[in-house]
């Protein structure tokens, strides 16, 4: 994340995705907020989930994420937007969400998917602009 190039953008994308799982489990969104662009839908949804867990007394178990960008050097920054569009392979461990009474309200099995993570710079720091499905074609 220390370099202002595709390698730095890839490191920021991997870190943010992995931090998302931690933020939910720890109910701590401080680092996630700092890297979330105000227009990022995925970011907003994740921050809302953390806030819900904190206010409702619910908990999130499992869900650890591992993120990987294969060959970051092949990605180029969009000159008009300044954004690096990166394809990130994400493995998420099985997870369970319970309410304050310990009643399971959601669960997901382990999954592997590829997501498009758009990474930009703001005031010299990396920010996540969006995380979405990889465009077809």
Specify the residue positions occupied by each region the protein language model found:
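Sparse, context-dependent recognition of short Cys/His-centered cofactor- or disulfide-binding micro-motifs
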Residues: 9, 17, 50, 69-75, ...
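Core segments of small alpha/beta cavity-forming domains
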Residues: 1-61
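N-terminal short leaders/motifs
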Residues: 23-26, 68-86
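Residue-level signal for well-ordered alpha-helical segments
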Residues: 1-2, 8-9, 27, 63-67, ...
């Amino acid at each position: 994340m220390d370099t202002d190039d595709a390698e730095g953008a890839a490191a920021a994308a991997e870190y943010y995705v992995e931090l998302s799982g931690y933020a939910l489990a720890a109910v701590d969104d401080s680092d996630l907020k700092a890297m979330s662009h105000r227009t990022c839908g995925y970011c907003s949804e994740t921050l809302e989930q953390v806030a819900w867990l904190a206010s409702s007394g619910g908990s999130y178990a499992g869900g650890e994420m591992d993120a990987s960008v294969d060959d970051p050097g092949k990605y180029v920054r969009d000159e008009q937007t300044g954004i690096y569009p990166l394809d990130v392979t994400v493995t998420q461990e099985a997870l369970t969400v319970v309410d304050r009474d310990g009643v399971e309200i959601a669960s997901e099995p382990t999954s592997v998917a590829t997501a498009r993570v758009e990474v930009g710079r703001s005031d010299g720091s990396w920010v996540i602009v969006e995380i979405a499905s990889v465009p077809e074609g």
